[in-house]
Amino acid sequence: MLRLVVASPGAFSPRGLHDRRVVITDSADSPLAYGSRIGDGYSIIVPEVASFHFRPGSQDVAVQAEPLVAPERVLDAYYGAALPMAVQVVLERQPLHASAVVVPGIGAVAFAGVTHSGKTTLAYGLSRRGFPMWADDILAIDAFGVEGVSTIRLPYRLNLRAPSAAYFEGRPETGVARGEQDPGEWATAPLVAFCVLERRDRRPRAGSSVVRLPPTEGLMALLAQAFWFEPQTSAERRQMMRDYLEVVARVPGFRVSVGPSLDALPALLDEVEAKVAACLRPAA
């Protein structure tokens, strides 16, 4: 597990831009966060908000906030930028840009995709059908866990956008209460399926919105949504590739086409449920 701690004043000196590499960008490809490393120390810098510092072998992620920055902005920077990088460096697990739910008694289903693709909306919609939320926006994957490919439940704050929140407000939940205790942060669950979301400007004309991905396409789709620290060594790059190759070799993947209208969400959730359930059902 990881824990966020406040760095003592002056513990870390600022680094010049020439020593930094972009690690996270926004939808317009503008830099949001930078990475830097000195010896065995790693830093994530979110300009005008905070810098975060961590190293292998320590559970602490030390934060040094800029003056007068609201705590909420610092926490947003931690969850969105520092946490995924610390997962890779400290925990040696792969952070994926994904939300996830749990199929009780079976395992986690991930929904990966770019910002605004509908990850949180789909996961939250399924949570209202009786599949508890497991992750929002960042999912930690352990490709070589004791029980195969597994996930780690990271700390998160639900980031349901205003149109989706308005859509769900007042609509009844349809899931049956399952009476399971919340496993809490840092719990683990097998990864039993992953879905890569593809945003469409218009509703698909015909055919399925949920299509099984062959492993090669699944690998490329997951790598497109993977977080990784920069600068990255060749050994770290090889390990990341080994991990994702293991994921696509053992876990079924799907491409999910998401249209622009929330009115189509119930039908899409029905199809996701049916396709994933059919894949998880034991062969006769």
Predicted segments with their positions:
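Glycine-rich, often acidic-flanked micro-motifs
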Residues: 99, 103-114, 128-284
